[in-house]
């Protein structure tokens, strides 16, 4: 197991790197994994298992009004992509995990985006 707090930061940054410091991926998007895990708009849906019944391409996630408060799920939002502080299994854009909305940590962030 790698201890990320004491590991050699071979990219030159011990924690987060400045936005856009490395080349974009093939889609032209910067920093999709390894910098910070990002909050997304999706609510956690533990009861209906939304992602198994959602469209394959661009699932927008359930809305809170469509989720019953089952086992705390209606109070949790989704984090996606891994961060500098996560394990190797989190270092892909498709990784996701539910956390309570008030959860804060130094390796979490969000991405501002707009349609163009």
For the regions a protein language model found, what residue spans apply to each?
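Surface-exposed recognition segments
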Residues: 2, 6-17, 26, 31-116
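Active-site neighborhood of thiol-dependent amide/isopeptide-bond enzymes
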Residues: 23
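Acidic/aromatic-lined carbohydrate-recognition and catalytic surfaces
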Residues: 20
């Amino acid at each position: 197991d790698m201890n990320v707090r004491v590991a050699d930061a071979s990219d030159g940054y011990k924690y987060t790197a400045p936005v856009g410091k490395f080349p974009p991926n093939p889609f032209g998007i910067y920093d999709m994994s390894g910098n910070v895990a990002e909050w997304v708009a999706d609510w956690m849906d533990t009861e209906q298992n939304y992602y198994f019944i959602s469209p394959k391409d661009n699932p927008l996630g359930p809305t809170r009004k469509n989720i019953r408060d089952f086992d705390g799920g209606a109070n949790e939002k989704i984090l996606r992509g891994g961060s500098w502080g996560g394990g190797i299994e989190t270092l892909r854009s498709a990784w996701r995990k539910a956390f309570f909305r008030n959860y804060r940590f130094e390796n979490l962030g969000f991405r501002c985006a707009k349609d163009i």
